[in-house]
A protein has these predicted regions:
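Conserved glycine-rich cofactor-binding loop
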Residues: 25-26
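Residue(s) in the substrate-gating loop at a strand-loop-helix junction
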Residues: 148
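The beta1-alpha1 cofactor-binding region of Rossmann-like NAD(H)/NADP(H)-dependent oxidoreductases
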Residues: 50, 70-82, 112
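Active-site helix of classical SDR
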Residues: 130, 164-165
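C-terminal helical subdomain
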Residues: 188-189, 208-252
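Conserved glycine-rich Rossmann-like NAD(P)H-binding loop of the short-chain dehydrogenase/reductase
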Residues: 39-55
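Substrate-binding pocket helix/loop in short-chain dehydrogenase/reductase
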Residues: 106-119
C-alpha cells in the first residue's frame, strides 16, 4: 500500500507537459530543453540564430518533441510573438523557463548601444516574458527564472550584469507572492560559474573544460537537473529559490 507520507506519491510527472524555454538552443537553455523533453515534456524554444535553432531542434528531437522559432527577444514586441507562437504550437503551456541572457561587462567599458541591448535581453525581456507567461498559464503552472549568483558576488567588472540579476532576484520574489493565489509557482534558480557557449572574458573553452574537471565550474546540465527538481515538486510545495554552485568555486 502506498504510504501517503512519502512526498513522491504526489510528485507530478512531466510526461505531456507543455514547456516554453526562452533561448533553449545553447548552454543552460539547451540543456534544460533536452532534459525536460527526455522526460516527455513538449518544448518550445527560440534563438536569434536560425542555425542554432535548427541544431537544437535536431538534438531535442532525438529524445523528445520540440518546436521553435528564430526571434530576437531584445525587441519587446517579439516577446509576445514568441509566447503566442508557443501557446499556439503547444496548445497551451504548463511552465515557462525564462532563461535567455547575454554577458555584460562594467558600465564604464560598454558602449551605450551594447548597454541598451544587454538591458533589453537580460532584464526587460525577463519582465515581459513573465507578463506573457502569467497570462498564458492563467490558473496553474510554473515560472522559473534562471538568474545568477552574480547578484551576490559583485565584481569590479560586473556592475551591469550584477545589477540586472539583482533586479531579477527582487522581481522574482515579489512575483511569487503576487501569483501564489492564482496557483502559479515562481522560482529563481541562481547558478554559479557555468560552462557557456558564449565565452567568459579571457576564459577559453579549454580553460572552461579544465575548470569543470576541477569542480570549479558547473556544466549546463547541472542547472537542467535543478529545473527538473523544481518542476516535479508536489503541488503543496514550492522551491522559492535554488542556488547551484560548483563545489570548489573560487571566491571572487
Amino acid at each position: 500500500m502506498t504510504n501517503e507520507a512519502d512526498a513522491h506519491t504526489r510528485q507530478p510527472a512531466l510526461d505531456g507537459k507543455k514547456v516554453l524555454v526562452t533561448g533553449g538552443t545553447t548552454g543552460i537553455g539547451r540543456a534544460i530543453a533536452v532534459l525536460l523533453a527526455s522526460y516527455g515534456a513538449e518544448i518550445f524554444i527560440c534563438s536569434r540564430d536560425p542555425r542554432h535553432l535548427e541544431d537544437a531542434l535536431r538534438r531535442i528531437g532525438e529524445v523528445g518533441k520540440a518546436h521553435g522559432i528564430a526571434i530576437d527577444l531584445a525587441d519587446p514586441d517579439n516577446v509576445k510573438l514568441f509566447f503566442d507562437a508557443g501557446v499556439s504550437a503547444l496548445g497551451g503551456i504548463d511552465a515557462a523557463i525564462i532563461n535567455a541572457a547575454i554577458p555584460a561587462e562594467g558600465i564604464s567599458t560598454m558602449s551605450e548601444e551594447d548597454l541598451r541591448y544587454a538591458i533589453a535581453v537580460d532584464f526587460t525581456a525577463y519582465l515581459l516574458s513573465a507578463h506573457a507567461a502569467a497570462q498564458a498559464l492563467e490558473d496553474h503552472g510554473d515560472i522559473i527564472f534562471v538568474g545568477s549568483m552574480a547578484a551576490h558576488m559583485l565584481g569590479a567588472e560586473s556592475s551591469v550584469y550584477a545589477g540586472m540579476k539583482k533586479g531579477v532576484q527582487g522581481f522574482s520574489e515579489a512575483l511569487r507572492k503576487e501569483l501564489a493565489p492564482k496557483n502559479i509557482k515562481t522560482c529563481l534558480i541562481e547558478p554559479g560559474k557555468t560552462g557557456a557557449d558564449f565565452q567568459y572574458k579571457d576564459f577559453t573553452a579549454q580553460e572552461q573544460a579544465e575548470a569543470i574537471r576541477k569542480e570549479e565550474m558547473l556544466r549546463a546540465e547541472d542547472i537542467a537537473v535543478g529545473v527538473h527538481y523544481v518542476l516535479t515538486q508536489p503541488n503543496r510545495a514550492i522551491v522559492q529559490q535554488l542556488t547551484i554552485a560548483p563545489r570548489q568555486q573560487p571566491k571572487e
